[in-house]
Amino acid sequence: LHHSKHHATYVKGVNDAVAKLQEARANDDHAAIFLNEKNLAFHLGGHVNHSIWWKNLSPDGGDKPTGELAAAIDDAFGSFDKFRAQFSAAANGLQGSGWAVLGYDTLGSRLLTFQLYDQQANVPLGIIPLLQVDMWEHAFYLQYKNVKADYVKAFWNVVNWAE
């Protein structure tokens, strides 16, 4: 359902917005240009965020990362458990819809956690998202109802650290 309906809707939204944007530009319809640029950003953000998220999940996932990523997490957060607590707090503390993210800051050469709001892919400049969890209600409501904390706790059992 999540992949075949929600993610597919974002892809369709990208295609529709691109077509409408081309038409609006050809007609010099500035209001439609701005509207469709906004719609394109939203749907493209939804597509990009979900594409990263699918790679972050595996039925064989869980446990902890190893190697360079494990060392970077320990360096940035003090331990994997402290990182997991901070990332989970970002996810559970998100007001409304969005994503919790572990990103690599290419400017500061460090890992950090942050929240993304909605789907606008408003990732700070220089940040490469490494791990994301979808905190839109459609991601957890069917199975976890309104108990976001249970969803976030279960997320750690399917994190694909190999990717």
Swiss-Prot record:
Binds 1 Mn(2+) ion per subunit. It catalyses: 2 superoxide + 2 H(+) = H2O2 + O2. Its EC number is 1.15.1.1. Pfam families: Sod_Fe_C, Sod_Fe_N. The keyword Metal-binding applies. The keyword Transcription regulation does not apply. It is an enzyme of class 1 (oxidoreductase). It comes from the Bacteria. Keywords: Manganese, Metal-binding, Oxidoreductase. GO terms for molecular function: metal ion binding; superoxide dismutase activity. Its cofactor is Mn(2+). SUPFAM superfamilies: Fe,Mn superoxide dismutase (SOD), C-terminal domain (SSF54719), Fe,Mn superoxide dismutase (SOD), N-terminal domain (SSF46609). Destroys superoxide anion radicals which are normally produced within the cells and which are toxic to biological systems. Belongs to the iron/manganese superoxide dismutase family. This is Superoxide dismutase [Mn]. The gene is sodA.
